From Swiss-Prot:
InterPro entries tied to this protein: Ser_deHydtase-like_asu (IPR005130), UPF0597 (IPR021144)
GO process annotations (BP): L-cysteine catabolic process to pyruvate
Family of this protein: Belongs to the UPF0597 family.
Name under which the protein is recorded: UPF0597 protein YhaM
Top-rank taxon: Bacteria
Disulfide bond annotation, renumbered to this chain: none
Pfam families per UniProt: SDH_alpha
Lineage, broadest ranks: Bacteria, Pseudomonadati, Pseudomonadota, Gammaproteobacteria, Enterobacterales
Molecular functions (GO terms): L-cysteine desulfhydrase activity
Amino acid sequence: MFDSTLNPLWQRYILAVQEEVKPALGCTEPISLALAAAVAAAELEGPVERVEAWVSPNLMKNGLGVTVPGTGMVGLPIAAALGALGGNANAGLEVLKDATAQAIADAKALLAAGKVSVKIQEPCNEILFSRAKVWHGEKWACVTIVGGHTNIVHIETHNGVVFTQQACVAEGEQESPLTVLSRTTLAEILKFVNEVPFAAIRFILDSAKLNCALSQEGLSGKWGLHIGATLEKQCERGLLAKDLSSSIVIRTSAASDARMGGATLPAMSNSGSGNQGITATMPVVVVAEHFGADDERLARALMLSHLSAIYIHNQLPRLSALCAATTAAMGAAAGMAWLVDGRYETISMAISSMIGDVSGMICDGASNSCAMKVSTSASAAWKAVLMALDDTAVTGNEGIVAHDVEQSIANLCALASHSMQQTDRQIIEIMASKAR
C-alpha cells in the first residue's frame, strides 16, 4: 500500500497504476475468455464436459490470431477450453499460469471432440464482452465479463443467480482512480513523478523485471515473427547499427515476439494489454541503462511512462481500431524524454510528434504481427524524443496536432472513439470473411 500521508490526488494516481499495470500471462482478450471459463468451471458441480462461449466482435478480432501460452495453438476455442479445464479462477489475468500438461492435453481433446464453441454475441453493444457457459450433463454454470478483462458482472448456474454486479454507485463512494485521472493533465502527472517519495512508487520496477525477462526470452528467436532476434542478427552482420536506437527497437520487439508467440512468461500489462505494458516499459529501461540510471530514476521514468499511457488510453474505447501500442509508446516517449532532459516542454513536444507520426496505425487483431507495430511505435517514440531535444516537433499548424499537447491527445482520441468505429467494423468484417 502507499503512504496515506500523500495528497489525495497522488494516491489516486498510484491506485490507477496499480489497477491498470498488472502481470498477465498470454494475450489479454483470449485470457479474458479463459478467466470466464475458469470461474464458471469453479461453480460447476462436476467436471467440464462441454464449453459454449460468446464474445464481442472486438474481442473476437483480438482472439483469432494469437497463440495461447503453452498450447502451441491459436484462437479463442483453446483459450476457453484450457480455462475451463486447467485455469486458476483466482488468478485474474494469470488464469493459465498453473495449467498442467495434462490440462492442455484434455483441452485439446475437448476441442477435437467438437465440445467447444465460440460465437460472436449478437446483438452486442459492449466493446469488451466475454461469456462462458460450461456443462456437466444437464448441470451448467455461466460467467459474464463486461467492460474490463477481469470485470465479472454475472455468475449463474442451473440452480440460479450466484452473483450480479451492482451498477449503481453507493452514496458517498469515492470516484474511481481513472475518473480522477481523466480530469488531470500531463503537467500535473509530471509534478507527481518529480516529487512523489520513491518508496511510494518503487513497485513499478516490477514492470521492468517482468518485461525484461520476456524480452530476453524473445531474443532466443523461438517466438512469433522473432523480429527482435532477427534485427539483432542483422546488427551482427553489419546491416544495422549497434546503437541505442536499435537496442530500443530490438529489446522491445523481442518482448512482444515472446508475448504473442505463446511464451509461458507473464508480461506486465498496461490498460489491459501486455503489448501496451511492454511498449511503455522496455524503451524506458533501455534508455535508463544507457545513462546508468539508478533504481529511483528508473522508477520515476517508468511511472511517468505508464501513467501517461494510462492517461491517454483512458480517453479511448478499451478496444478500438487504433493500435494502442502507439499510445503506450507516447508514454514511453515521455519517460525517455524525462530521463534525458526532464523538461515538460520536451515531453510535450515528443508526444505531439508521436501523434503526428503514428496516429493512423490500425489494430487488425492480436497476432504475431503486433510485434511489428510495437517495434514501429518504439522507434517513433525515440525519434520524437531526439527531435524534441533539438527543440523541434510537429506543430499545431499540421494535421490533427494542436498547439497544446492536451488538445492533440483529445483530437487523436476523438478520431478513435468516433470516426474510426466504422474502420473497426470494416476490419472485423474482413477478418471474419478470412476465417470462413
